[in-house]
């Protein structure tokens, strides 16, 4: 008798493990059906357009409102763009965002760098 029950019990356990959500199906969230009923009472459906309006209204009621994305405050210097300097170092003149003290020659603003009309003299 025990050997006959063992395969059926194991198969039942396998089915229960494969479908875990079926045991929770008895608990139904009635807020969606209540919202649907209220919308039907307010405005009876007019064909497919009424159904679409009803469906979107129910979705709007169920989902929480989205928060706007985090806004980053940019300073005036960063909004204008980076400024570059010409530094004279061991290997000669070069572009850089910052120079060590004593080797800064010219300060080149961002707009002049974009125009590419700057002539780099050889020292």
UniProtKB/Swiss-Prot annotation:
Coiled coil: none
Keywords for the protein's UniProt record, in alphabetical order: Antibiotic, Antimicrobial, Defensin, Glycoprotein, Secreted, Signal
Principal subcellular localisation of the protein: secreted
Sites where a glycan is attached: 29
The keyword ATP-binding belongs to this UniProt entry's keyword annotation: no
One GO process term, biological-process aspect: defense response to bacterium
Protein's cellular compartments: Secreted
InterPro entries in UniProt: Sperm_Ag_11A_B (IPR007988)
Signal peptide residues on this chain, from the entry's feature table: 1-25
GO cellular component, one term: extracellular region
Cystine connections: none
Family as reported in the entry's similarity comment: Belongs to the SPAG11 family.
PANTHER family to which the protein is assigned, alphabetical: SPERM-ASSOCIATED ANTIGEN 11A-RELATED (PTHR14081:SF1), SPERM-ASSOCIATED ANTIGEN 11A-RELATED-RELATED (PTHR14081)
Role description: Has antimicrobial activity against E.coli. Plays a role in the defense response in the male reproductive tract, contributing to sperm maturation, storage and protection.
Protein name as it appears in the record: Sperm-associated antigen 11A
């Amino acid at each position: 008798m025990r050997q006959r029950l063992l395969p059926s019990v194991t198969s039942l356990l396998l089915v229960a493990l494969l479908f875990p959500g079926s045991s929770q199906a008895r608990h139904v969230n009635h807020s969606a059906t209540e919202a649907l009923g209220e919308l039907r009472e307010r405005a009876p459906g007019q064909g497919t357009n009424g159904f679409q309006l009803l469906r979107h209204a129910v979705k709007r009621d169920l989902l929480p409102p989205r928060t706007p994305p985090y806004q980053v405050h940019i300073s005036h210097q960063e909004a204008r763009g980076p400024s570059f300097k010409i530094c004279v170092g061991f290997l000669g003149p070069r572009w850089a965002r910052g120079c060590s003290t004593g080797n800064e020659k010219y300060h080149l603003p961002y707009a002049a760098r974009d125009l590419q009309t700057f002539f780099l003299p050889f020292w």
